[in-house]
Swiss-Prot record:
GO MF annotations in UniProt: mRNA binding; nucleotide binding; RNA binding
Keywords assigned: Nucleotide-binding, Nucleus, Repeat, RNA-binding
Domain RRM residue range list: 150-225, 247-323
Compositionally biased tracts (Polar residues): 25-40
Annotated gene: CID12
The species this protein was found in: Arabidopsis thaliana
Tissues expressing the protein: Expressed in roots, leaves, stems, flowers and siliques. Detected in flowers only in growing organs: gynoecium, petals, stamenal filaments, anther walls and ovules.
Motif (Bipartite nuclear localization signal): 122-134
Protein name: Polyadenylate-binding protein-interacting protein 12
Location relative to the cell: Nucleus
Entry note about domains: Contains a PAM2-like motif, which seems to be involved in the binding to the PABC/CTC domain of PAB proteins.
Length: 336
């Protein structure tokens, strides 16, 4: 049985989309000022010590101590990664071997990444909604710009790569707050935005540009936009709804001339049986969006390959849904 629903004007739409990508801008560092202030503060202390020692032995003891301190500091590695206890880490990917690692779907990626002894990426926490506060209409311009500096734009993403796998590639370079993949109607590949908790993680992630993920090397650049937040009331509330999300896709740029049956038959002929279909639109937009829930999760994964396919007169955009398709009081159509 398949349930098809259509919602007309004045309907609330999932706020899970992305701000359209644009050519990236350079990211500036704000660390030099703090470093300079620390240096100036330290010189005053050293001068006081130097005067005191010079009065006692002509400054030889002070010079000797400074040479020993300089020798100790010279042996430190300023680029060393923070030590993370093994109890706080768990493998993101497996199969690490000789600079290569296999993601869950069998793809292979290459690169030099910081890893633990068991071959997993070194990280603090898995990515999610923790960390920095998400943007909302009241977010100040300064906060918005700060979020953008913590975000990178990733292009040329293989259709079979999931958000979890993409985040797993970047999580070794900083804590990931959010990862959002979107389909590109003009390409068989996709693009994404990844937000880190700090600017250091975003700058370090730029080194991953050119890394093989799936069958294509990804491109990583600073972002000019930030990830649009998802309305928390739409997010899955139970384990059953999370399972529903795994079987659901979010489809945009749908030709208004297409009927519900047209869309259902298209996805069933290419991907698998459709359990529920909901279309949303109004009179003000030239296209519609839809949520397609399949009977099997494998069908939803296969549907991601349809992004960019011409359906009617427009190429559709397909991405994984972050929200389940919840039942209305009375479905308009039921198809067996």
């Amino acid at each position: 049985m398949a349930v098809i629903e259509s919602v007309g004007a004045n309907t609330t739409v999932e706020a899970g989309g992305l701000i359209s990508p644009s050519p990236p801008s350079s990211v500036t560092s704000q660390e030099s000022g703090a470093s300079s202030n620390n240096d100036h503060g330290g010189n005053g202390i050293h001068d006081e010590i130097g005067v005191h020692v010079a009065r006692s032995d002509g400054g030889e003891s002070f010079k000797r101590d400074m040479r020993e301190l300089h020798e100790l500091l010279s042996k430190l590695n300023p680029m060393a990664k923070e030590f993370i206890p093994p109890s706080l880490t768990k493998p993101v990917v497996n199969g690490f071997n000789g600079g290569f690692f296999a993601v869950n779907n069998g793809f292979v990626a290459a690169g030099n990444f910081p890893v633990n002894e068991d071959g997993s990426f070194r990280r603090k926490k898995s990515f999610g909604q923790q960390g920095k506060r998400r943007m909302n209409p009241r977010t100040s311009l300064a906060q918005r710009e700060e979020i953008i500096r913590r975000t990178v734009y990733v292009s040329d993403i293989d259709q079979q790569v999931t958000e979890e796998q993409l985040a797993g590639l970047f999580i070794g370079f900083g804590q990931v707050v959010d990862c959002r993949i979107c389909g590109d109607p003009n390409s068989v590949l996709r693009f994404a935005f990844i937000e880190f908790t700090d600017e250091v993680g975003a700058r370090t992630a730029l080194n991953l540009s050119g890394t093989m993920l799936g069958f294509y090397p990804v491109k990583v650049m600073p972002s000019k936009t930030a990830i649009a937040p998802v309305n928390p009331t739409f997010l899955p509330r139970t384990e059953d709804e999370r399972e529903m999300c795994a079987r659901t896709i979010y489809c945009t740029n749908i030709d208004k001339k297409l009927t519900q049956t047209d869309i259902k038959l298209f996805f069933e002929s290419v991907c698998g049986e459709v359990y529920r279909l909901r279309l949303l639109g109004d009179y003000h937009h030239p296209t519609r969006i839809g949520f397609v829930e399949f009977v099997m999760a494998e069908s939803a994964i296969a549907a991601l390959n349809c992004s960019g396919v011409l359906l009617g007169s427009l190429p559709i955009r397909v991405s994984p849904s972050k929200t389940p398709v919840r039942s209305r009081a009375i479905p308009r159509h039921q198809m067996h």
